[in-house]
Amino acid sequence: MSIPLAERIRPKSLNDYLSQKHLVGENGAIKSQLDSQMLSSMIFWGPPGTGKTTLAMILAEESERPFYMLSAIDSGVAAIREVIEKAKKSDTLFSTKNPILFIDEIHRFSKSQQDSLLKAVEKGWITLFGATTENPSFEVIPALLSRCQVYVLESFSRTDLEALLKRAIDKDEYLSKKKVILKETEAILRLSGGDARKLLNILELVVLSENSDAVTITNKMVLQKVQKNTVLYDKTGEQHYDIISAFIKSIRGSDPNAAVYWLARMIEGGEDLKFIARRLVI
């Protein structure tokens, strides 16, 4: 099918939003803002596939605000200014329902691009939602960061992933027509790495590769179809230092299992072996 499974079953309301209960559950910080209809500018910080874009879309829908979306990968200052001008002409301007501008991968914006947002946020022409996989303290300019609340989105838990699998099989227009049985889930859950999008991509790949209306999913089947899990590891970002720190702490704490795990993460992610060796002798 042309539309990916993750898009077909994207949640449309907070009631259907499976994860991030610390933010959107009862007494959650974002849920409280939504209930009071006083949404502030926000930065959603978390790994891929944790629902950052979906959350932004749901908040716009449930607060009944105009919603504009830009990707920092292919948008420049001209695109930002165009959206701001549209927002300024909105009927909801200067109300509690001013337009929302969502910028995906906001960490990719240069300083000048981020600067172009400041006046619009300051004047209340827009409420800014930004999504990033990088630490906003390093990637978002201080003037913009001070005008936004930063919320950390966590990787999906095992329980959330299992619920997502069941929802996809039961609710998706295509999968629900097949008899999909989850006999074993360990492999598909492990390969997803807490990434909801990746989980759904694997599920769809496995089901579509079977030319049958009845599909029984096993660990062996998943591993045969996927073959290799690409480890999430950034050799130049904050994760680079977090993982080497965890590795060294595991050694100092005499925890061989943890030390081997962190070492394997670095090697699988393509870390420079000389870097690891240098840290070992410090």
What is each model feature region?
Residues 2-3, 32-71, 85-88, 118-123:
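Walker A/P-loop
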Residues 2-47, 86-89, 259-263:
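Pre-Walker A (pre-P-loop) alpha-helix and adjacent loop at the N terminus of AAA/AAA+ ATPase modules
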Residues 23-28, 67-100, 111:
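Short glycine-rich substrate-engagement loop in P-loop NTPases that contacts/grips substrate
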Residues 31-34, 103, 107-146:
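Conserved catalytic/switch belt of AAA+ P-loop NTPases
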Residues 71-74, 149-162:
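Conserved AAA+ ATPase "SRH/arginine-finger" region at the nucleotide-binding site
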Residues 186-191, 197-211, 221-227, 245-249, ...:
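C-terminal helical "lid" of AAA+/P-loop NTPase domains
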Residues 230-282:
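Conserved P-loop NTPase/AAA+ ATPase motor core
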